[in-house]
Regions:
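Bacterial Sec-dependent N-terminal signal peptides
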Residues: 1-23
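Generic short amphipathic/hydrophobic targeting helices enriched at N-termini
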Residues: 6-8, 192, 198
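Compositionally biased non-globular segments, especially hydrophobic aliphatic-rich helices
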Residues: 10-17, 184, 199-202
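Surface-exposed acidic loop/strand-edge motifs in secreted or periplasmic proteins
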Residues: 22-133
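Extracytoplasmic electrostatic interaction patches
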Residues: 117-184, 188, 195-197, 201
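Short, solvent-exposed mixed-charge patches
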Residues: 209-211
Length: 211
C-alpha cells in the first residue's frame, strides 16, 4: 500500500513539474507604431522575415524612432526631385509627392557590407486597410499605381534611391512566400520573462531584389 501511495505521489509531482514547464504560444509580434511630422507607420523588428533583400545586404536592424524621423526627413525633402518623371502616376493616379500625408508606412531595416543602415519604406494608400493589418505583416502589392510605392534611404550616405511605383490596374495583395513572423511564447508561470522564438532570415535565389 505504501509503495502504491509513493508511486502515485511521484506521478503527480512529475505531472505538476511538466505543467509548470509548458510554454503556451500566444499572439504574433506586432510591429512598433510610430508617428511624426506628416507620417504614420510601423517599424518591423530585425528578426521579422521578409520576401526581399537589398543590394550588398549583410544583415538586418530594427529602425529606431530617431532613424525613422531622419529617414522621413530625407525622403520628404527629396521626393519631389526623385519623382519628377511621375512614373505610373498618370490620369486618375495620384502624384505621390503631392499626397505624402495620405500614405501609411512600413519600415524595414537592412545593413550592407559596409555597415550602412538602409531603411526600406513601404507606402500604402488604401482606406480599406486596417491599422491592425498594417501592423501584422509587411504587405507587398501589385497594381494600384500611385497609391502604392516603396523607396530606400541609406542613413550613412543620406542617399534616397530605388523609387518603385506600382503599375496601373486593380490592387492585389501578394501572398507571403516565407514563414509567419516571430511568435512570442509565454510560460504559464507569469513571473517568468516572455520567450521569443526567432525565425531568422532565409536568403535564397528566389528572393526579390529591389534595386
Amino acid at each position: 500500500m505504501k509503495k502504491l501511495f509513493l508511486a502515485i505521489t511521484v506521478t503527480i509531482f512529475a505531472l505538476c513539474a511538466h505543467a509548470q514547464e509548458y510554454v503556451e504560444p500566444v499572439e504574433k509580434w506586432k510591429a512598433a507604431e510610430v508617428w511624426g511630422i506628416n507620417y504614420h507607420g510601423w517599424s518591423f523588428h530585425q528578426d521579422w522575415e521578409v520576401d526581399f533583400t537589398v543590394e550588398s545586404q549583410d544583415g538586418r536592424f530594427t529602425p529606431t524612432d530617431e532613424e525613422i524621423a531622419e529617414t522621413e526627413g530625407l525622403i520628404q525633402k527629396r521626393i519631389d526631385y526623385i519623382n519628377q518623371d511621375h512614373y505610373n502616376q498618370e490620369g486618375m493616379c495620384p502624384i505621390i509627392d503631392e499626397h505624402m500625408r495620405m500614405y501609411r508606412r512600413q519600415y524595414v531595416g537592412f545593413t550592407n557590407d559596409r555597415g550602412d543602415h538602409i531603411v526600406w519604406v513601404n507606402f500604402l494608400w488604401d482606406d480599406n486597410l486596417s491599422n491592425e493589418k498594417l501592423a501584422s505583416d509587411i504587405l507587398l502589392t501589385k497594381g494600384g499605381c500611385g497609391h502604392f510605392w516603396h523607396i530606400k534611404c541609406n542613413l550613412a550616405t543620406r542617399k534616397v534611391y530605388g523609387l518603385e511605383v506600382n503599375e496601373s490596374g486593380d490592387i492585389q495583395y501578394l501572398p507571403r512566400v516565407k514563414k509567419p513572423a516571430p511568435r512570442i511564447s509565454r510560460s504559464k508561470d507569469r513571473n517568468k520573462k516572455q520567450k521569443v522564438r526567432k525565425t531568422g532570415i532565409i536568403h535564397s535565389p528566389e528572393e526579390k531584389l529591389f534595386k
